[in-house]
Amino acid sequence: MQIYSSEIVRIGDQAKLFLDEGIIVFFGDNAPEELQDFAVIHKLEQIFGEIVIGTKINLSDANLEVVSVGPVANENFKNLGHLVLKVDSSTEEAQLGDVKCTFDKKPNIEIG
C-alpha cells in the first residue's frame, strides 16, 4: 500500500555529503532558505498513512525498509515535509524525528 509520494525538486549542495554518512534530510518545498543547502527538497503530494516499521521506501534506484521510527517523525513529515532517513547499518533506535532504514544499496539522489 502506498502511503505517500513525492518528487525531488532540488538537492542542496551539502546533501550528498550527508548521504555519504548515511543520512538523507528531506524538507518540503517551503523550507527556509538556510535549511535548503543540506537538504533534499521535495514536493510532497498526499500522505495516505504513517511511516511504520516495515514500510518500504522506493528512493530513486534503491529499496529501503523502515526498521525504527522516532516518536515525532510522522508529525514532522505531515506538517513540514521534513524527514530524516538514516540508511546506515547501525542497530541503534531512531532518534526523535529520524526514520532508520535498511537498504539493498545506498540511494542515488536525483531530481525528479
Q: Where would I find each of the regions flagged by the language model?
A:
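Short, well-ordered loop/turn sites that connect or cap secondary structure elements
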Residues: 49-51, 57-58, 109-111
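Short, solvent-exposed secondary-structure boundary/capping segments
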Residues: 73-84
